[in-house]
Amino acid sequence: MINPIVKTIELPDGRTITLETGKLAKQADGSVMLRMGNTMLLATVCAAKDAVPGTDFMPLQVEYKEKFAAFGRFPGGFTKREGRASDYEILTCRLVDRALRPLFPDNYHAEVYVNIILFSADGVDMPDALAGLAASAALAVSDIPFNGPISEVRVARIDGQFVINPTFDQLEKADMDLMVAATYDNIMMVEGEMHEVSEAELLEAMKVAHEAIKVHCKAQMELTEEVGKTVKREYNHEVNDEELRKAVREACYDKAYAVAASGNNNKHERFDAFDAIREEFKAQFSEEELEEKAPLIDRYYHDVEKEAMRRSILDEGKRLDGRKTTEIRPIWCEVGPLPGPHGSAIFTRGETQSLTSVTLGTKLDEKIIDNVLEHGKERFLLHYNFPPFSTGEAKAQRGVGRREIGHGHLAWRALKGQIPADYPYVVRVVSEILESNGSSSMATVCAGTLALMDAGVKIKKPVSGIAMGLIKNPGEEKYAVLSDILGDEDHLGDMDFKVTGTRDGITATQMDIKVDGLSYEILERALNQAKEGRMHILDKITETIAEPRADLKDHAPRIETMTIPKEFIGAVIGPGGKIIQGMQEETGAVITIEETDGMGRIEVSGTNKKCIDDAMRMIKAIVAVPEVGEVYKGKVRSIMPYGAFIEFLPGKDGLLHISEIDWKRLETVEEAGIKEGDEIEVKLIDIDPKTGKFKLSRKVLMPRPEKK
């Protein structure tokens, strides 16, 4: 007998979310079916009983999958089944992973797999905002150790009002789109985009989201009680040697502190100095002893190194590379280093460097999006590549990973609002990270701004980005907010808070917090400190190039657009595409046409102005409305005993009656020297109101002979 347990959560606007367990996927360690309207997500979690030998990290894998059947659709492709994860699914995985990962115990190293599957969708409610809640609820009803629960909500600002988990339609009207994950007590993760909002407005949105999350967390706690999973499984994944831990600290801490406070701004030299301390300590042991003790020494020394770095910052205000907490690394920029792309730039900040290129394309280059719930075309693309050599690693480069997709998406969100909505070009920005020591996604934003301006893209305002960090020990009042963090400060610190924006406000943000008890006061300080840093970086950008170039590069495509009444779309295309293809062959231009907002939108692109002008002239002739009294240059299509048929506009023929050819009487058309294929000037003298036929005259354009 199945006896499911159901919990209902009510949103501020009266909509409800239900969490049901005990009915589906009962062999998983935990499973929950979440439902909101007709959107249904099944989240399952399974954990291995034992840790993977030699593992000193949290082997968590989060998968999010949308089934096409959920929305009554067939998958595309030859096989007609779901394939590899889309970018949207990967980004949703990352949102959930980043919220869950910090809350597993530090000494828990068993493999944990979280699977979230969209089984039903209505196209109204957005499933990505529900995935975090579903995953946390599955953990809540399991016996897997987890310091949750958490929940994740989307908060949008629409007409000045904050809305929790807006619908697809509502989100289109929002000027702020923020995903927030939190426990009952603390915010853990934030990511979103916005239309140049202030720091205070961003904080307000976080607070609104957190209040909604508290309700979700309370429901999960009640669910845990009802299921009877308040006591989690016992585990022992770490073997410790307290004497060895003490010995490592006594022998290494002062030396590690000296390196941390030395102010060496060379990452590899610092790494070698820290590594030498550990190897010196290991040298006292035999090879046989090290087989057992080396993993423990590595773990204990990592803790020592972390503490030394943190204490140097908290006690002396000295960072690893010698900077003050608010100081930005040296910046140099260059625009136009590459002659081939339509725009390019180098942005270097300390040991982080991005070489970014911009390519301009036509409508044919748009990216087609065909996910389960997301359809359309994207005209602004940003790709981020992170090769191993950027950190000096000797390893093969594989395909694009989740991290690269996530970092590229953040930079895309930061910049996309500055591309004018009516900009005719499809724009692709590609950031190649050539060096990395922290904040490479923010370097991408800065290099992207420079490259777009170098390409002559008429961006509204330049955008810069900065990554902020935090050092805060539990139970200590003292803390330090760090501007422009290094990779080690990200790894050994408590927060990674990325903020991008123009001079007038924030355009995108991403925050991951690894510590409990982070107050809004600290967040406010971090945001204000980030603003100072952003303004400094913007100054460096505008010193290099103050505004977009007036003209495109010579080898960039040229585009002209025009709109026509939709009833002329067929005339421009022609039967089987004959007319439009003929124009393209004749002129060398690329012509695209689509119906938008009840009008035909035509885009003509080419490598030179002449081919575009020729194509535009031909299109204008096709869509021109014949006017009585206008003079046209037409081609003789056929000759009849009673006159000639003239094509005076593309696709429009009129009769030039024999009596209208000349003032003198003609027996045949040929007497006037007219033959098929000739081009002659004619005047439209009448349009038959019943048949719509056109009557032309040639003689009215000729001098009338005087009467004898």
Swiss-Prot record:
Swiss-Prot/TrEMBL catalytic activity: RNA(n+1) + phosphate = RNA(n) + a ribonucleoside 5'-diphosphate
One GO cellular component term: cytosol
Domain of life from the UniProt record: Bacteria
Domain KH per the UniProt entry, residue ranges: 557-619
Role summary: Involved in mRNA degradation. Catalyzes the phosphorolysis of single-stranded polyribonucleotides processively in the 3'- to 5'-direction.
Binding locations of Mg(2+): D490, D496
Disulfide topology: none
Pfam families cross-referenced by the UniProt entry: KH_1, PNPase, RNase_PH, RNase_PH_C, S1
EC number(s) reported in the record: 2.7.7.8
Chief localisation class: cytoplasm
UniProt xrefs under InterPro entries: ExoRNase_PH_dom1 (IPR001247), ExoRNase_PH_dom2 (IPR015847), ExoRNase_PH_dom2_sf (IPR036345), KH_dom (IPR004087), KH_dom_type_1 (IPR004088), KH_dom_type_1_sf (IPR036612), NA-bd_OB-fold (IPR012340), PNPase (IPR012162)
Keyword Signal: no
Enzymatic class: transferase
Domain named S1 motif: residues: 629-699
Naturally occurring in which organism (per UniProt): Bacteroides thetaiotaomicron (strain ATCC 29148 / DSM 2079 / JCM 5827 / CCUG 10774 / NCTC 10582 / VPI-5482 / E50)
Coiled coil: none
Protein family: Belongs to the polyribonucleotide nucleotidyltransferase family.
GO BP terms in the entry: mRNA catabolic process; RNA catabolic process; RNA processing
Classification lineage: Bacteria, Pseudomonadati, Bacteroidota, Bacteroidia, Bacteroidales
Cofactors (names): Mg(2+)
Keywords of this entry: Cytoplasm, Magnesium, Metal-binding, Nucleotidyltransferase, RNA-binding, Transferase
Stored HAMAP family: PNPase
Location relative to the cell: Cytoplasm
Name of this protein: Polyribonucleotide nucleotidyltransferase
GO molecular function: 3'-5'-RNA exonuclease activity; magnesium ion binding; polyribonucleotide nucleotidyltransferase activity; RNA binding
